[in-house]
UniProtKB/Swiss-Prot annotation:
Keyword Ribosomal protein belongs to the record: no
Transmembrane segments: 7-27
Gene3D superfamilies for the chain: 1.10.287.210
Designated name of the protein: ATP synthase subunit b'
PANTHER family recorded: ATP SYNTHASE SUBUNIT B', CHLOROPLASTIC (PTHR33445:SF2)
GO cellular component terms attached to this protein's record: plasma membrane-derived thylakoid membrane; proton-transporting ATP synthase complex
Subunit structure comment from the entry: F-type ATPases have 2 components, F(1) - the catalytic core - and F(0) - the membrane proton channel. F(1) has five subunits: alpha(3), beta(3), gamma(1), delta(1), epsilon(1). F(0) has four main subunits: a(1), b(1), b'(1) and c(10-14). The alpha and beta chains form an alternating ring which encloses part of the gamma chain. F(1) is attached to F(0) by a central stalk formed by the gamma and epsilon chains, while a peripheral stalk is formed by the delta, b and b' chains.
Location of this chain's protein in the cell: Cellular thylakoid membrane
Alphabetic keyword roster: ATP synthesis, CF(0), Hydrogen ion transport, Ion transport, Membrane, Thylakoid, Transmembrane, Transmembrane helix, Transport
InterPro entries cross-referenced by the UniProt entry: ATP_synth_b, ATP_synth_b/b'su_bac/chlpt, ATP_synthase_B_chain
Length: 142
């Protein structure tokens, strides 16, 4: 079946030479390209994970800052509303005091005019009473 003659070692030599040539020409560059591609993918994957972690960290940080800013703006708004309410209450109180003072002044002026009018009327009543009395007594005396 098999002859073990000089062709067998020659065939083995050709086979090993073919394997060496294929290894040098085809398999090493292919393996090198696959290794480079694998390294590139691993590097990109690692960088992507790092970027994702950094993005998540920044997102959390910005959300915390946003929540803090919202609380701060709500506090500023509440303070402004309280201050506006306080100012409005102060102005209302001051206006009420001014109105009360005006009312008191008007009442005092009316009271003064009333007293003046009563005193004038009393003078006129006295004068008229005197005139009536003079006419009545003067006509009965005459």
């Amino acid at each position: 079946m098999f002859d073990f003659n000089g062709t067998l070692p020659l065939m083995m030599f050709q086979f090993f030479l073919l394997v060496a040539v294929l290894n040098a020409v085809f398999f090493k560059p292919l393996t090198q390209a696959i290794d480079e591609r694998d390294g590139f993918i691993r590097t990109n994957n690692t960088e992507a994970r790092e970027r994702l972690a950094k993005a998540k960290s920044l997102t959390e940080q910005y959300e915390q800052e946003l929540a803090g800013t919202r609380k701060q703006s709500q506090q500023v708004l509440a303070d402004a509303q309280a201050e506006a309410q306080k100012i409005a209450q102060t102005q209302i109180t001051e206006a009420q005091k001014q109105v009360q003072a005006e009312v008191m002044k008007a009442q005092a002026e009316l009271e003064s005019q009333k007293q003046s009018a009563f005193s004038e009327l009393e003078k006129q009543v006295d004068t008229l009473s005197q005139q009536i009395l003079n006419k009545l007594l003067g006509s009965t005396l005459a």
